[in-house]
Amino acid sequence: MVSGGFGVGKTTFIGAISEIEPLVTEASMTEVSIGIDDPGHRADKTATTVALDFGRITLDDSLILYLFGTPGQDRFVFLWDDLVDGALGAVIVVDTSRVEDCYPVLDYFEDHNTPFIIVVNRFDDAPHFDLDEVREALGLADWIPVLDCDARDRDSVKNTLVALLEQVLLHRAHPRHREVS
């Protein structure tokens, strides 16, 4: 799963790596969303995911990785339960200008005992914090990876997914990592 707050780059992340044209369920943002959906520094954002994004990567003939992106607005969180069922893990995308938007996302995956990693998608006009500052702000254990990722760049997204798969293996091999610290 690829998750995070509203407008952090989840759709872009999936689009950068998917070997198929990603399935996106975007709708135009309207005046009704003013005050509910805050695009922050992304004032140019005109569409939003309303159900899910879907992409696919074939790792080899017998292993295909399916990517499901969650909608970022709180009013669509009820859809997440269907998406998390059977998920190996989650990439939680963070925008440093709105770190607080990822707290409910962290809680969700911790409550569902889903291994996850944190990736900071750097926006040009967002405040810069080093990864240790992000870890501290989120109250994360040392064994949870916090990485930089450019959601537009295929290699950056690929490295992120490798880190997620490593975290999934760690989670399965060491039960203590299943406990929230």
Q: Where are the regions that the model predicts?
A:
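Conserved G1/Walker A P-loop phosphate-binding module
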Residues: 1-42, 56-66
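N-terminal first-folded block
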Residues: 43-46, 52-55, 90
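Short secondary-structure boundary/capping elements
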Residues: 49, 71-76, 97-101, 129
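Conserved beta-strand segments of the P-loop GTPase G domain that flank and frequently precede/overlap
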Residues: 67-70, 90-95, 118-122, 148-150
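Inter-motif core of Ras-like GTPase G domains
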Residues: 73-97, 107-112
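Conserved C-terminal guanine-recognition region of P-loop GTPase G domains, centered on the G4
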Residues: 93-143
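Canonical P-loop GTPase G-domain recognition
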Residues: 124-181
